A protein has these predicted regions:
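Structural preference for solvent-exposed beta-strand-turn elements
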Residues: 1-179
Length: 179
């Protein structure tokens, strides 16, 4: 008998615990950019990285959102979780801590209270590389100022997808102002 599995695949690959409410919030935000149907099935999933905390990434080959969550990580690792299925399961769990364990052959155990689910994940190596966006100087401004900027311009944004260029707001940043 020949085993094609590597030793790493047979071991525990990731384990973390976090609050259900934080996990739901992260899935709601990162899930906004997950592709619903794609010729590249891995982008229908959420890239889940557990290191110091938990990082959830959704990407549709145009837009990416990464959401960081406080989590107790006992075993660092990463995998791709099926976004819709994982989100549906987490939303139905009881309130409190949720423990996710990714083990042998990317079998995922999700536990909270008396509830327990098992699903399959995929290797994070299959996830497309995200574009580098750290090319400029970061801009910091209070949340209320950003909200006022958006509120003052959002009325002019088109909802018609026929001309995607009109469905966004352009920010121009100079040394001392944002317009």
């Amino acid at each position: 008998k020949i085993s094609l599995n590597t030793e790493k695949e047979r071991m525990l690959t990731m384990r973390f615990t976090c609050e259900k409410s934080m996990l739901v919030a992260g899935l709601n935000i990162a899930g906004r950019t997950v592709a619903q149907k794609s010729i590249l099935p891995v982008i229908e999933g959420i890239l889940c990285r557990a290191e110091v905390g938990l990082s959830l990434t959704g990407y549709n080959m145009e837009t990416a959102i990464t959401y960081d969550i406080e989590a107790d990580v006992s075993e660092a690792g990463e995998c791709i979780l099926p976004a819709r299925l994982f989100g549906d399961i987490v939303r139905r769990l009881p309130e409190g801590p949720v423990t996710v364990v990714v083990g042998e052959d990317y079998k995922v155990s999700i536990r909270a209270g008396y509830a327990s689910f098992t699903i399959s994940a995929e290797s994070a190596e299959d996830y497309p590389e995200l574009p580098d966006v750290n090319t400029g100087r970061p801009v910091k401004l209070p949340q209320c100022q950003l909200k006022n900027l958006i509120s003052g311009t959002i009325f002019a944004v088109s909802e018609n997808q026929g001309r995607p260029i009109h469905t966004g707001v352009k920010f121009e940043v100079t040394n001392d102002s944002i317009t």
